[in-house]
């Protein structure tokens, strides 16, 4: 798979070892203030191509990793490697590897679900959380268990859990 930096010349693509695997990370900007951009499903770090230069121009160092199993990031075999706990550990390890003094997580879709849970578990690990497209887990769970309307709307989430 081509690196984002081969397509967008203002982005650098680096390899970051975190939580025992190699992450492909698109990066732009410098400094101790990090914006960690977590993409959705079925997306890729290139999702953030328009936000990265804007944030870098504001003085942030921007990291947009391809999450575990996406792009050129390592693809561990077996569903146990994709549990929410492991994905939250990935976020913690990426933050640690960045050595940033201030961290903002910007997340969309599947990345937002991971970010919500990470922020609830480790509130002191980040300074800001920006979520696109995903409600807080508490009202979402309430809507899912209240009746069939939301469950019907989110049928595809369950569909993708089937072991083909």
Predicted regions located by residue number:
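Flexible "cap/lid" subdomain of the alpha/beta-hydrolase fold that forms the substrate-access gate
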Residues: 2-12, 21-23, 63, 70-106, ...
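Conserved HGGG/HGGXW glycine-rich cap/lid loop of the alpha/beta-hydrolase fold
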Residues: 27-74
């Amino acid at each position: 798979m081509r690196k984002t930096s081969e397509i967008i010349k203002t982005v650098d693509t680096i390899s970051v070892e975190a939580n025992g695997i190699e992450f492909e990370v698109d990066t732009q900007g410098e400094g101790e203030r990090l914006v960690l951009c977590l993409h959705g499903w079925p997306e890729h770090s290139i999702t953030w191509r328009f936000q990265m230069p804007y944030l870098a121009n504001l003085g942030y160092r921007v990291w947009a990793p391809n999450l575990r199993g996406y792009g050129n990031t390592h693809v561990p075999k077996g569903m146990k490697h994709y549990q929410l706990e492991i994905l939250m550990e990935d976020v913690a390890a990426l933050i640690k590897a960045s050595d940033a003094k201030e961290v903002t997580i910007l997340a969309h879709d599947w990345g937002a679900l991971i970010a919500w849970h990470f922020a609830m578990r480790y509130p002191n690990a980040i300074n800001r959380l920006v979520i696109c497209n995903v409600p807080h887990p508490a009202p979402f769970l309430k809507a899912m268990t209240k009746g069939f309307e939301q469950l019907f709307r989110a049928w595809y989430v369950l569909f993708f859990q089937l072991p083909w």
